[in-house]
């Protein structure tokens, strides 16, 4: 009597109530171990497929056991580089990205293998878009990196937008669609930098930068006495009174010092126009004056010179205030 032909795995799936749902321990200790030992007929219900040569939505059709939730495959882990340690996980339009840590699978107290979870992303790392396709990769302990593994493919039905099983074919508009979210984030982050760069590249921005650099350099470098400081010291120090007759040698008079609101004295360099005014003022002073009328004229000329210096200081304060306003506007745009 001839022996009955073996029942094909595809035939057994047609019976109602049949469901192929092995546990993690069964996948490693029975199916994967028997496959690596060469016992092909006892594990032929799980086909061997090069998973990374296909997209995840094409793999369910290659499964022997038909299902709507999970599918199982044997797959050899290929290396990304011939002499490297990374596994090849890229497909034509996407890649499988490992999430979380590699977990141990125990049978009792003995570790028999490892389990790793991967998620499929469309695009290229690191800007790929996550999909609803998940995969658990089971590997035995003590085998090489390119050894055979079992892959449990699943589709997360609760994932947003998972009603579309197959995304459209990749093209230039698809790549732009994948990067829309990243472009929106980068636009909000770098928008103010573009505005500041545009302002600083203009003529007014360059002038502002040069003024800030000059002010910082002048605050760091000490003032070197110059010819302009010499006339400022003349107004601050005591001046020989040349208008009065010499009674007991040269008589000195006190000239009011230029002081700021904080009663501190600063050496401010005077422009060339003030130098010319001081020189002309000193030339007009007579050596001796016997009349009180000419004395009053000389003193009035001195006060005119002092008033001119105060006007110069006021103009310098206007420049400082303008510079502070420009810095405040720049900080406002930066914030």
From Swiss-Prot:
Per UniProt, residues of the NAC domain are: 14-156
Location(s), subcellular:
Membrane; Nucleus
Q: In which tissues is it expressed?
A: Expressed in roots, rosette leaves, cauline leaves, shoot apex, stems and flowers.
* Upregulating conditions: By glucose. Induced by salt, drought stress and methyl methanesulfonate (MMS) treatment.
What's an example GO BP annotation here?
Answer: cellular response to glucose stimulus
Q: Which UniProt keywords apply?
A: Activator, DNA-binding, Membrane, Nucleus, Stress response, Transcription, Transcription regulation, Transmembrane, Transmembrane helix
Q: Which domain of life is it from?
A: Eukaryota
**InterPro entries documented for this protein:** NAC-dom, NAC_dom_sf
Transmembrane feature ranges: 315-335
Q: Which residues bind DNA?
A: 112-162
Offer one Pfam family short name for this entry.
NAM
Among the entry's GO cellular component annotations, what is one?
membrane
| Membrane topology type | Single-pass membrane protein
Give any GO molecular function from the UniProt entry: DNA binding
Q: What does this protein do?
A: Transcriptional activator activated by proteolytic cleavage through regulated intramembrane proteolysis (RIP). Transcription factor involved in modulation of abscisic acid (ABA) signaling. Attenuates ABA sensitivity and glucose-induced ABA accumulation. Reduces the expression of ABI4 gene.
Q: What is known of its domains?
A: The NAC domain includes a DNA binding domain and a dimerization domain.
Its recorded name reads: NAC domain-containing protein 60
Q: What is the taxonomic lineage of the source species?
A: Eukaryota, Viridiplantae, Streptophyta, Embryophyta, Tracheophyta
């Amino acid at each position: 009597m001839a022996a009955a032909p073996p029942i094909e795995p595809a035939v057994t799936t047609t019976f109602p109530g049949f469901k192929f749902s092995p546990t993690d321990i069964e996948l490693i200790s029975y199916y994967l171990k028997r496959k690596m030992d060469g016992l092909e007929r006892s594990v032929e219900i799980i086909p061997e497929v090069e998973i990374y040569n296909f997209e995840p939505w094409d793999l369910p059709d290659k499964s022997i056991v038909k299902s709507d939730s999970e599918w199982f495959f044997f797959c050899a882990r290929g290396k990304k580089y011939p002499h490297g340690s990374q596994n090849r996980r890229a497909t034509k339009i996407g890649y499988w990205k490992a999430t979380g840590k590699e977990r141990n699978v125990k049978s009792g107290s003995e570790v028999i293998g490892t389990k790793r979870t991967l998620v499929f992303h469309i695009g290229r790392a690191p800007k790929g878009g996550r999909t609803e396709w998940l995969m658990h990769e089971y590997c035995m302990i003590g085998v090489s990196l390119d050894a055979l593994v079992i892959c449990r493919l699943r589709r997360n039905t609760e994932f947003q937008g998972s009603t579309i099983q197959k995304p459209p074919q990749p093209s230039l508009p698809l790549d732009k669609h994948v990067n829309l979210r990243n472009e929106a984030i980068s636009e909000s982050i770098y928008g103010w930098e573009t505005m500041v760069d545009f302002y600083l590249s203009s003529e007014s921005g360059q002038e502002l930068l040069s003024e800030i650099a000059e002010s910082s350099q002048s605050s760091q470098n000490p003032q070197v006495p110059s010819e302009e400081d010499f006339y400022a010291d003349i107004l601050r120090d005591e001046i020989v009174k040349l208008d009065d007759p010499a009674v007991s040698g040269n008589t000195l008079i006190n000239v009011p010092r230029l002081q700021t609101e904080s009663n501190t004295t600063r050496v401010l360099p005077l422009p060339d126009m003030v130098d010319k005014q001081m020189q002309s003022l000193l030339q007009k002073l007579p050596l001796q004056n016997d009349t009180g009328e000419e004395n009053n004229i000389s003193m009035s000329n001195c006060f005119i010179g002092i008033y001119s210096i105060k006007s110069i200081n006021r103009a310098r304060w206007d420049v400082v205030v303008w510079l502070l306003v420009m810095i405040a506007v720049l900080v406002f745009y930066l914030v």
